[in-house]
Amino acid sequence: PPSDGRFHGGTKVFCGLAGTVMRFVPGLAMFADGPVAFDGDEQAYARPMKPVLDGLEQLGACIEYHGEEGRLPFTITPPQTVSQCAEPSVVSIDSSGSSQFISGLLLIGSRVPGGLELHHTGEKTPSLPHIRMTVADLHGSGVRVNADEHARVWTVQPGAVQLPETVTVEPDLSNAAPFLGAALIAGGTVRVPHWPESTTQPGGMLPGYLERMGAEISFPVIDDVRYCEVTGNGHVSGLGDFDLTAAGEIAPSLAAILVFADKPTRMIGIGHLRGHETNRLEALANEITRVGGAAHELPDGLEITPVSANHLRPSVMETYADHRMATFAAMLGLRIKGIQVKNVATTAKTLPNFVDLWNDMLV
């Protein structure tokens, strides 16, 4: 917060479809001098918000819902007075639906009087690497955080945030998934620059996953730039039971590849994808079926069963205003002739120049 400790209230935040905005910014409203309203695209009204808002209520905020409870739109009224506590405030939420609920609360933990002791009550922690990324960033800003991942408890000590003078922001590695995966589907080699030597991003697991599916992986350094290079020959190995809990965001790209695999794959640990930009499990099952493939939802994931190539057919693919469903459809078009992608412009959320990059790759 500013030096006086308070942001300006009496304002409205429009979140669009951005999950990080709708789940990270509400915590800042705890430090406003008045109510802050939050709204977003109509499609965002379907995205779950309740765990992070429950956490803010446990910290003293008042939440007024203007639609369905636990979802946008809503107004947050911060606590009238800030209590001085020697012990951390204990907050318990079920973050099974998104790691962002935990991250959103951890980010404000050091400014909570006495600090924050955050308990995740769910059985699984989705996208744990994202939470580790949050903790690493807090450590880099002088915030003391203790993470007991086995007990699913995070403790943030109170104190000032000391931002470093410079911060290196890694490229979003999950955006590389459609391009690197293209090498497996179509055969050939794809090289993505500026691949970090180490990372906390779930997308950093992508090369290992692609290798299990039959790709050759290397990391050449050319003119001091480190690349991730993937080579495929058009053959895709199915993965059987495949736990993707840690990296569910790349599930659509992996699903596109696995449509052409040599045996079935059951991607599990990704039930939380039902609460993403769209219900991605339902959308993936629908679109794979649309092109003549075989896929069905599982309670916690998606099963894809390969079919012969002559069963796959040209189709007009729905994208559900979801950037990852658009790139998924483009990947299918590498091997299925006659694929058309509705509203490919939805990729602008994360890759405004996706179409140009895709076409350049295929030249």
Task: Please identify what each model-predicted range represents.
Residues 1-363:
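Short, structured segments at the rim of ligand-binding sites
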